[in-house]
């Protein structure tokens, strides 16, 4: 595997049974960084059960089981390589915690692949009000995924098979919906494919001579690599803090924005502790500077392990991370059994922090499709609603405006073990905190 290629994170979304697993399985089978031995083992097992059961979805399920049993393919099982990129598929389709993982974006997706079935009735089910085609597309947009590819799947099962008319119909209906979410449709390829037969996945389909756009892999190769926000102020949400004997305090986290250099003075917020960076490591290699996307451990002098914790954020003294007295956000309610009113206090999961935050005002209810205000100061909001809401964290929490620092400005609301909603921060009222520099 040539490590020189840039890495892209791809999230695969779409309605249940529209063929996500089969499609991913087929691509992994053809391009995946899965060793031959594993593939052979799976194929032999398939032969034993009768050829028909070697479906690509079944391959994916087998790989998932292997991963859960901790077999060696754990790391590579969801990676595949194209001419230009190495792709990591975030979250295999059908994952229970799919929505939660997509939101908190532990590994933020650079692009989304939306799989829709062209089979009669199936496309319509995905587009119904409770359809996942709609829900996942809304989520992707809310979470800041601006690069989208649509795979119009099961083209072998249209009436008649390989129907251009059905493809055009889906492209029109779905295109209109995606446009209403704010996607630039001229940049969204719609690729007619069959995950089952492999048509238009890697090679051109002889069954659809009417289509002259890219194959799925060509479309994946034409995605843009994510920009590195090095010119923004430094932000490093802390994942863990270690005290290493003979070294000292070592916070660990991913640089989201800005650049960290050896010798820099940094401040950890909310505790307002200041330290000096003595060394930086990434994957056990010493480096002089760290940039966005780097997962690092850095040794700081002047700060003890007791002073800082997971959920704190490191920045430079001239532009410290913002601690919120209150923050205002655009939220979308995914699930709630009754109604949400002022006083409701879900746990806000934002960057590496999770802090209960009270709703102190529901400013407006929005049309989830257009974002326009439909009601000022509503009494309550419920499942399926979008709204502008003001929160007060019950203990100090670093929150930034989404427009300034996207990874520190999007969050999930959790309660009762479920994701209640997702949100993006539109405004922050900062808490006044004095930073003592010795």
Curated annotation (Swiss-Prot):
One of its GO terms (molecular function) is GTP binding. InterPro entries: EFTu-like_2, G_TR_CS, GTP-eEF1A_C, P-loop_NTPase, Small_GTP-bd, T_Tr_GTP-bd_dom, TRAFAC_GTPase_members, Transl_B-barrel_sf. Residues 194-196 are annotated as: G5. Residues 5-228 form the tr-type G domain. Keywords: Cytoplasm, Elongation factor, GTP-binding, Hydrolase, Magnesium, Metal-binding, Nucleotide-binding, Protein biosynthesis. Residues 14-21 are annotated as: G1. GTP binds at residues 14-21, 91-95, 153-156. It is an enzyme of class 3 (hydrolase). Residues 153-156 are annotated as: G4. Residues 91-94 are annotated as: G3. Its EC number is 3.6.5.3. GO terms for cellular component: cytoplasm. Its main location: cytoplasm. Mg(2+) binds at residue 21. It is found in: Cytoplasm. It comes from the Archaea. It catalyses: GTP + H2O = GDP + phosphate + H(+). Pfam families: GTP-eEF1A_C, GTP_EFTU, GTP_EFTU_D2. Residues 70-74 are annotated as: G2. Coiled coil: none annotated. GTP hydrolase that promotes the GTP-dependent binding of aminoacyl-tRNA to the A-site of ribosomes during protein biosynthesis. Belongs to the TRAFAC class translation factor GTPase superfamily. Classic translation factor GTPase family. EF-Tu/EF-1A subfamily. This is Elongation factor 1-alpha. The lineage of its organism: Archaea, Thermoproteota, Thermoprotei, Desulfurococcales, Desulfurococcaceae. The gene is tuf.
């Amino acid at each position: 595997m040539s490590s020189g290629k840039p890495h892209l994170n791809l999230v695969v979304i779409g309605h249940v049974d529209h063929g996500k697993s089969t499609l991913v399985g087929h691509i992994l089978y053809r391009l995946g960084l899965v060793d031959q031995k594993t593939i052979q083992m799976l194929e032999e097992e398939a032969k034993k059960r009768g050829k028909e059961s070697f479906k690509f979805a079944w391959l994916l399920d087998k790989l998932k089981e292997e991963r859960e049993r901790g077999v060696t393919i754990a790391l590579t099982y969801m990676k595949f390589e194209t001419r230009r990129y190495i792709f990591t598929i975030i979250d295999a389709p059908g994952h229970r915690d799919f929505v939660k993982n997509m939101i908190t974006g532990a590994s933020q997706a650079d692009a989304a692949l939306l799989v829709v079935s062209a089979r009669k009735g199936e496309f319509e089910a995905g587009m119904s009000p409770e359809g996942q085609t709609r829900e996942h597309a809304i989520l992707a947009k809310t979470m800041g995924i601006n690069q989208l590819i649509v795979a119009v799947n099961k083209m072998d099962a249209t009436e008649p098979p390989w129907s251009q008319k059905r493809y055009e119909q889906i492209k029109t209906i779905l295109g209109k919906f995606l446009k209403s979410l704010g996607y630039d449709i001229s940049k969204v390829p719609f690729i007619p494919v069959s995950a089952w037969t492999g048509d238009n996945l890697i090679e051109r389909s002889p069954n659809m001579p009417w289509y002259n756009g890219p194959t799925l892999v060509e479309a994946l190769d034409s995605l843009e690599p994510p920009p590195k926000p090095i010119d923004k102020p430094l932000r490093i949400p802390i994942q863990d803090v270690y005290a290493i004997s003979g070294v000292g305090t070592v916070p660990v986290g991913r640089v989201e924005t800005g650049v960290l250099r050896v010798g820099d003075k940094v401040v950890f917020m909310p505790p307002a502790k200041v330290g000096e960076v003595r060394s930086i490591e990434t994957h056990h290699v010493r480096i002089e500077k760290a940039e966005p996307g780097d997962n690092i451990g850095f040794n700081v002098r002047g700060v003890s392990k007791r002073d800082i914790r997971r959920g704190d954020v490191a920045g430079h003294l001239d532009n410290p991370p913002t601690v919120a007295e209150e923050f205002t956000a655009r939220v979308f309610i995914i699930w709630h059994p009754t109604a949400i009113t002022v006083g409701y206090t879900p746990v806000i999961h934002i960057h590496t922090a999770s802090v209960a935050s009270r709703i102190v005002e529901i400013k407006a209810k929005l049309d989830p499709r257009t974002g326009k205000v439909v009601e000022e100061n509503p009494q309550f909001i419920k499942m399926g609603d979008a709204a502008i809401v003001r929160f007060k964290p019950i203990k100090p929490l670093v929150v930034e405006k989404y427009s300034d620092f996207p990874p520190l400005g999007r969050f999930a609301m959790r309660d009762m073990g479920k994701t209640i909603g997702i949100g993006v921060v539109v405004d922050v009222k900062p808490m006044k905190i004095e930073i003592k520099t010795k």
